[in-house]
From Swiss-Prot:
This is Large ribosomal subunit protein bL17. It comes from Xanthomonas campestris pv. campestris (strain ATCC 33913 / DSM 3586 / NCPPB 528 / LMG 568 / P 25). InterPro entries: Ribosomal_bL17, Ribosomal_bL17_CS, Ribosomal_bL17_sf. Belongs to the bacterial ribosomal protein bL17 family. One of its GO terms (cellular component) is cytosolic large ribosomal subunit. GO terms for biological process: translation.
Length: 127
């Protein structure tokens, strides 16, 4: 019985899951918008939101903690320089999950994961 066992396994080993969410969180912090399956998006919240909370207070200990969880210098730098100050007054709820239909190959439910309050860049219209 799996009573009180939180988290999804995704038919992966624990190391594979950890690496997958580490990479997804780093990509999310770099690009501020990623597309993935809906269950992975929901599980990514459990990884990314605490990291943004850590990023709100810049310091050596917090940077080392974030680097230990992300293993990506560029993502950690952006987390503390850009994202932490942006969400300094927000008490959680840093991610938005938007459903994005179904994947063509296997009909898996897809979703966009984006950081709330991200600056929207106007796209150029090619003529």
């Amino acid at each position: 019985m799996r009573h009180q066992k939180s988290g999804r396994k995704f038919n992966r080993t624990s190391a594979h899951r950890e690496a997958m969410f580490r990479n997804m969180a780093a990509s999310l912090f770099k690009h501020e918008l990623i597309k993935t399956t809906l269950p992975k998006a929901k599980e990514l919240r459990r990884v990314a939101e605490p990291l943004i909370t850590i990023g709100k207070v810049d310091g050596v200990a917090n940077r080392r903690l974030a680097f230990a969880r992300l293993r990506d210098k560029e993502a950690v730098g952006k987390l503390f320089v850009e994202l932490g100050p942006r969400y300094a007054t927000r008490p959680g709820g840093y991610l938005r999950i938007l459903k994005a239909g179904f994947r063509a190959g296997d009909n898996a439910p897809m979703a966009y994961v984006e950081l709330v309050d991200r600056p929207v860049v106007a796209e150029e219209v090619s003529e």
